[in-house]
Each structure stands twice: as C-alpha cells, then as structure tokens.
A protein has these predicted regions:
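Cys/His-rich microdomains that often coordinate metals
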Residues: 8-12, 25
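Catalytic phosphate/metal-binding cores of nucleic-acid and nucleotide-processing enzymes, i.e., regions
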Residues: 49-57, 64, 91, 100-103, ...
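Catalytic cores of nucleic-acid endonucleases
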Residues: 68, 112-172
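Non-catalytic C-terminal interaction segments of nucleic acid-processing enzymes
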Residues: 31-32, 112, 153-201
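Acidic-basic catalytic patches of nuclease active cores, encompassing PD-(D/E)XK
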Residues: 34-93
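Short Cys/His-rich micro-motifs in 6-15 aa windows
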Residues: 20-30
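Active-site beta-strand-loop-beta-strand hairpin of nuclease catalytic cores
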Residues: 98-117
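Short cysteine-rich clusters marking metal-coordination/redox-active sites
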Residues: 4-7, 18-21
Length: 201
C-alpha cells in the first residue's frame, strides 16, 4: 500500500504526498468535488414511467387480440429497429419523426384476413382527440386504441380528422367496432386487467 512520505497516511502514489500534506505544502486546498446524484433524473423518471405504462397498455391489447385468434405483429419503432428509442432521444429530423410515428401493431382479422394498423395509447383521463395525435400523422387508416382505468375504446385517425374524439362519456368502445368483430366478454375481461394494472396511476 502506498504511504505518504511525510506523515505515513494512505496515498495513491508510491513515494508521494497524501492530500492533506500536499495542500499544506502548497498552501492551497484542493477543490471539493460535488458528489454526483445517483439514480434517475426527474425527467428520466417521468419518461421511463410513461414508457412502462404504454408498454403495459400495448401488451394488454396484444394479448386481447391474440386471445381472439388475430395475427398480431409488433410494428412500432422499438420493435422494428431495436434500440432506436435511445438513439433518437433529442434528435429532430424528418426520418426520426417518421420512425417515431410508426403504429404499434399490424393486426390481421382471422376471418376476413383484413389487415389493420393499430396504435395503442394509455390515457388515465380516458380521453383522446386529434390534438393528441402528432401533426401530419402519416397513417390515416390506423386505429387508435385507448386504454384507460375503466375502458378500452377505439377511434380511427380518419374519425379524429372529422372532429370526433374519445371522451369519458363517449360510447366508442373497442367491442363496438364492426371491423374487428370482437367478443365483448373477452374485452370486459381485459378491461378488468386494465383496472388492476392502472388503478393507482
């Protein structure tokens, strides 16, 4: 172990001075290094928390459609290009914007074989309108599935463009969409899951 040549205390360097002896000799005080804060910043915590809520909502919808025999393909940016989320943080470009806007899923109806883009959103308020959609959203034929603490509702990008919206009192439930022809009892089961997961959010 290296010792100070003056006082014998621990030092980093063999045949060197410890910090106290060095400061006395040079009549200066080494700057106090501010201890770095450990853990996530508040901004990073919020980002990660919202990401987790979104992923839970996506998983609920994925499992709901899978349980009804749908072919479900994860399509969003984090699935098509793994690791891209971190790379695009703070990047402002047309390409980055297009990648961020990719819908979460491509789903195929087992009966009709129709294919749909599906974007999943969690909203504690249970509300969604055109102002919640990115400007110039390129997937005009996509369905927006909104998972809230109480309901699972659905609206198309086209309907949002016509001024329609999802509110706490609207009746645009996922089970009412004729395009999907879903079992309402299964949807109710998944609504109960949503209540369990998002009850305290």
């Amino acid at each position: 172990m290296a010792e100070c040549i003056q006082c014998g205390a621990f030092t980093k360097f063999d045949k060197g001075l410890c910090l106290d002896c060095y400061n006395k000799k040079n009549k200066s005080v080494a700057p106090i290094v501010k201890e770095e804060k450990m853990g996530l910043s508040d901004k990073d915590k919020t980002y990660r928390y919202n990401m987790i809520k979104g992923r839970i909502a996506e998983t609920l919808i994925q499992e709901l459609f899978l349980s009804l025999g749908y072919n479900v393909f994860r399509y969003g940016m984090e699935n098509t290009i793994p690791g891209i989320i971190e790379l695009l943080k703070g990047v402002r470009s047309d390409v980055a914007l297009e990648i961020r806007r990719m819908p979460d899923f491509v789903m195929q109806n087992p009966t009709t074989k129709d294919v749909h883009f599906v974007e999943v959103k969690f909203r504690a308020s249970g509300e969604f309108s055109s102002k919640d959609l990115p400007k110039d959203y390129p997937y005009g034929n996509a369905y927006i599935v909104v998972v809230s603490k109480k309901h699972i509702k659905c609206i198309t990008v086209k309907e949002l463009g016509e001024g329609k919206e999802i509110t706490t009192t609207s009746h645009n439930y996922l089970g009412n969409r004729k395009e999907f022809d879903l079992d309402k009892d299964v949807i109710i089961d998944f609504c109960k899951f949503a209540i369990q997961f998002f009850e305290n959010v």
